[in-house]
Amino acid sequence: GIMYVYVHPVNRYRLEVTRVGGSGYGYKIYERERLIIVQPFIPVVSGKRPFQSVQDAQCIGNLVLERIKAGNEFAISKADLDNLGVVY
């Protein structure tokens, strides 16, 4: 089920942080009501490992969201994970 919803007012995009398995987290990004990204695992990390905290999933989800809104390439790198202190 959905754990938290972060709505960006005056914007057509929204981020949802979701529970993955028993103890992990992922995120979904919607454009209005259309689901455009489902990310149940930490990107660019080998193996299918979910984020360890709501904060990590929210942080990376927000970075992707900001890049999408800016019209930029939104792929995540290991440097992004390191810069934001995401545990992987």
Where are the regions that the model predicts?
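Short N-terminal "domain-start" leader segments
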Residues: 1-30
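Short amphipathic alpha-helical segments, especially helix-boundary/capping motifs
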Residues: 2-3, 37-38, 57
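Compositionally biased, low-complexity repeat tracts
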Residues: 20, 45, 67-69
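A short, structured beta-strand/loop element
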Residues: 24-42
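A short, exposed loop/beta-hairpin motif centered on an aromatic-Gly-Thr core
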Residues: 38-54
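A short, charged, amphipathic alpha-helix used as a generic interaction element across diverse proteins
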Residues: 51-69
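A short, polar/charged loop-to-alpha-helix boundary motif
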Residues: 72
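Intrinsically disordered, low-complexity charged/polar segments
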Residues: 76-88
